[in-house]
Every structure is written in C-alpha cells, then in structure tokens.
Amino acid sequence: MPAHHTQHQMKNLCSTCSLRELCLPVELMPAEFDRLDAVIRQSRRLKKGEYLFRAGEPFTSLFAIRAGFFKTTVASQDGRDQVTGFFMSGELIGMDGICSQTHSCDAVALEDSEVCELPFVHIEELGHHIPSLQTHFFRLLSREIVRDQGVMLLLGNMRAEERLAAFLLNLSNRLYSRGFAANDFILRMSREEIGSYLGLKLETVSRTLSKFHHEGLISVEHKHIKLLDPQSLKKMVSGCAHAV
C-alpha cells in the first residue's frame, strides 16, 4: 500500500466544521475555538489503502476524521494483520500512542478520507487552560477502555450470530449519531476484515449474514446492508452492542 507521504494537505477549522460536536465538547466558547483552530495543522486527504500512521512510528498527534473510514491493525505472530478497530467521521484516532509515545498499530484508510491533525503537545497544553477540553479527552479515553472491554466480552462469550449482530448494531448507532440512516448503510470494510475484528472466519461471517438475510433480520446486497428487524438483533445481543 502507498505510504502516507503522498497525502494532500489543506487547512480546516474546528469552529466551522459540521462534525465539531462529535469531536469536541459542545460548551467551547468562540474564543476557545479560536485557540484550538490556531494549533491544528493542515488536514490530510488520503486515498483508499493509504496509511495514516504505522506501528512503531513516533506518536505526535491525534487525528479527527473529517470524512471517510479507517481500520486499525496489528501484526499477529503468524504475520497476518489482525483488525483491532474501525473508525468513522467524527471520531478521533491515534490514542494508542499516548502511553508509549509510539503507535502500537497501523491505521489504514478504507475509502478516500480526510483527517484533521491535532498535535498532542498543543492539545495537552490547551487542556490546562480549557478544562472542558481536558475532560472531553478523558471521556474519549474512557470510551476506548469500555470498547476494549466490550470486545473482550464479545470474543470470549458470544456466539457468531451475537458477535455479528452486535457489530451491525454498533455501526448503526454510530452512523445515526452522525446524521446518517441508522438502518440502511454500506459496509466500508470487507467480510474478511469483519471476521478478523470479530474473531470469526470469513466463511462464518458470510454464512451468518446469509442466515440473517433468510430470517428477515437484514437485507444484504454485496456491501449494502439494511436492518429490517433491529429489535430482534438487539434481543440477540442483550445490550452489548454499544461496546463493540
């Protein structure tokens, strides 16, 4: 895949971004937005398949996804890429590097995407002067911990049907919070990538999607998914969908 040095760059402002309420605390004042705008580096546009960052690279910034979809992966012992997460517009990516100051995973664009770069040293400094910003990032870190716990529960205790139902509901909820249709969406990732994330074989993912389709729970046409009976899917996962 192409390295990220080919990315196009341009300047965007948090204060005028339609996704700012997803990335940032809603109570920021205009003057605080101005201070934040001043530290944001030029945003990047990435083509599908380009790396935003790679495991082992120095951690310097968080990235707010302005448009597009990403996956994060780590190399397993046998050399295969293990998918560890999917990130969409309005979400922050790159927090894996805060602890060790190096990234622990690769981040790859699943479609043409755009991100805003937030230099961490400046964001950390701003947090001392804007308490709501610091609190917001603590909440984001907490959400990552909760999600990791949810994935551990999912991989350890849930059947294939429950894992896939939880995954679809989680996507639905996240898309809905961004103003998209909750029950009608396109999967940006492959079935193989879904299987890697959920700890399922490709054949199991395809078979389970077909099972849901024949049972009238969903409609499947290639990557186009419609949730026809989301309530039955929710009953299947017993409230665990929010964590994956």
Predicted ranges, named:
Residues 43, 62, 86, 117, ...:
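Short aromatic/basic micro-patch
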Residues 49, 60-73, 89-90:
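Glycine- and acidic-residue-biased ligand/ion/polar-headgroup-sensing regions
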Residues 52-57:
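Short phosphate-coordinating micro-motif centered on Lys-Gly-acidic
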Residues 70-82:
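A short beta-strand-loop-beta hairpin characteristic of the jelly-roll/cupin
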Residues 83-146, 150:
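Cyclic-nucleotide recognition modules
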Residues 128-201:
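Polybasic "coupling" helices that flank or enter modular domains
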